[in-house]
Design a protein with these regions (language model features):
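Alpha-helical interface subdomain recognition
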Residues: 1-80, 152, 232-379
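N-terminal glycine-rich flavin-associated loop
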Residues: 83-101
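Adenine nucleotide phosphate-binding catalytic loops in nucleotide-utilizing enzymes
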Residues: 220, 224-226
Length: 379
């Protein structure tokens, strides 16, 4: 297991950073709190960089890269709070690629943007495939899919779907009449499909409630393992974006601690500040190691990917929550005002920790699998 980046991965990361640097994404994130149209359209940039085809095989016009590479791109997006729809895009393309779908060439070229409509895989606490609740904590079952000739008819709703607004194709995880998970590709504008944009705490996130009423789509030929992989890939992507945001929180806070003086000393010389920022660094390095492990496991040790992605999501979510609060603390009064970037990262932390089951769900998954492994070893 070698987590050192290859020359190609370093180039990919630097290219992503360079592409994103052309846009004032953090300034736009602040303006978008009042006017959503202030966010720049980053989709053309993503297409130019080849991101829609990151996980698509080369034979279909994609880059044929792996999860590790995709997480590097996601981390750079998180670094500058860029509103690039990777969480919805890449799990959807992974499912389409596994199915060898006819739309792959259009997806890889960026002519067709898919979005993943997720369902949570079964666990010890919840044995079925479930979706986010509209409110409260009780999760409901995934949409129902009924066979209708060569197509599937969908009924049901999925709430708080990342990157669904503006998508052309929805890749939906549903359950069939036998209770088995299926993937259905359906046009976002098809009859019986409603994509309702919802207000979000973090203006850089695009969310929608998606409803199906007798909507017809085509079944994708994939098994449950592919659908589980897509769920955990989404978790790993959220973790990577969070890690990028933690890095920015740390960099900005350290720079301020060096230049802000009080009582004749830089505030960074005081133990209260030093210890808090050291804890941010510790959490950052721990989370990045787990992110790299998840990226490696998806290709080289797929049976460990669920645990690795859950661990990365759990660690990175807690790290960003801590780092965003530390950023406000270090900056004092100015850190709590809209003139500063700190509240933007705090908002990102609070919304990210709640998406797709939330950080707590990932933590529960780690606990379940760790305890199960310990019990098996003791048996």
């Amino acid at each position: 297991m070698n987590f050192a980046l290859t020359d190609e991965q370093v180039f990919l990361r630097e290219a992503a950073r360079g592409s994103l640097s052309r846009f004032k994404t953090i300034e736009a994130a602040r303006d978008a709190l009042e006017d959503a149209s202030a966010l720049p359209d980053l989709w053309p940039m993503a297409v130019e960089a080849g991101w829609p085809g990151l996980l698509v095989d080369e034979e279909h016009g994609g880059a044929g890269l792996g999860g590790f590479d995709a997480l590097l791109v996601a981390e750079e997006c998180g670094h500058v709070l860029a509103a690039v729809p990777l969480i919805g895009l890449l799990p959807a393309t992974a499912i389409l690629d596994a199915a060898g779908d006819e739309t792959l060439a259009a997806v890889a070229s960026g002519a067709l943007r898919p979005a993943y409509v997720p369902a949570r895989p079964p666990s010890e606490r919840e044995p079925g495939w479930t979706v986010e609740p509209a409110s409260g904590f009780a999760r409901s079952g995934a949409p129902l899919a009924a066979a209708d000739g060569n197509q599937m008819t969908l009924d049901g709703s999925v709430f708080f779907v990342p990157d669904a607004p503006g998508a052309d194709l929805l890749v939906v995880v549903a359950i069939d009449s036998g209770g088995e998970p299926v993937a259905v590709a359906i046009e976002a504008g098809a009859d019986g499909v409603t994509v309702e944009i919802v207000m979000r705490y973090d203006a850089t996130r695009s969310l929608a409630n998606v409803s199906f009423t007798g909507a017809r789509g085509r079944r994708l030929d994939v098994d449950a393992g592919v659908l589980e992989d897509a769920w955990y890939l989404a978790h790993a992507l959220i973790a990577a974006e969070s890690i990028g945001a933690v890095q920015t929180c740390l960099d900005v806070s350290v720079a301020y601690a060096k230049e802000r003086f009080t009582f004749g000393r830089a505030i960074g010389s005081y133990q209260a500040v030093k210890h808090e920022l050291t804890e941010v660094l510790r959490r950052l390095e721990n989370s990045r190691g787990l992110q790299y492990y998840a990226g490696w496991a998806r290709r080289d040790q797929p049976e460990e990917f669920a645990l690795a992605a859950s661990a990365a999501r759990s660690s990175a979510g807690a790290a960003l929550d801590f780092a965003a609060r530390a950023m406000i603390n270090v900056h004092g009064g100015i850190g709590a005002t809209w003139e500063h970037d700190a509240p933007l990262f705090f908002r990102r932390a609070q919304l990210s920790r709640r998406l797709l089951g939330g950080t707590h769900d990932a933590t529960d998954r780690v606990a379940e699998q760790t305890l199960a492994s310990a019990a098996a070893a003791a048996a």
